[in-house]
Amino acid sequence: ADNKKGAKIMEDEIDVILNHVSHLDVSNRDAFFVIAGLGGGTGSGAISVVCNSLKQIYDEPVYSVGILPAENEGDIYTLNAARSLKSLLPTCDAAILVDNGAFLHSGESVRQAYDRINSDIAKRLGILFRSGEISSKSQVAEMVVDASEIINTLKVGGICSIGYASEAVPKKRIFSKFLGKDQYETGKAARIFSVVKRAVKGRLLLPCDSKSTSKALIIIAGPPDQLDRKGIEKS
């Protein structure tokens, strides 16, 4: 778990990675995301080297996704993460951090929770990456979040976190028999506000006080007829 050795190895091999990146079809890329665990020696040492190299070559912003070790993983992993963050933050445009400990159930080890934590991370990043995508069969939403808005939000830099919440959409025909149109529309707005509140107050990738944030972006995905403007604006 020697992150200095990890950084040295990456410095020696960085040309291999950059060569692979240069051969990818990235003509429509908006940004780079570099993902690594910050507790071990390899990821904690290598991530800042990769981010710094990408920033020197490409104009697009470079974001890091760093996985922080849980408290029960050991002191050396905590020390590696602290050292890694110190070198990482100056080399990337923003750092999205994930606290392994925040996702563990009582008495559970990281190894036992590995798949679930990865799934939660992928779910949040997946919504972020798909923002603004429109397929030929899709209905275009009234308001669309695109890559430029995400980049503008992350422009403040520093440490970032992502929240997530979901709710099943009720079948309209069940409720429309008992509620008038105005009541049904009010219900949609309240549901959106509730989902956003749970995303912010619930399980963030990195627990933090939302009042201390410099900027925030709300992304709501779902059937267009359920995305009530009043609910979104209230959120």
For every predicted segment, state its role.
Residues 1-235:
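Tubulin/FtsZ superfamily GTPase core signature
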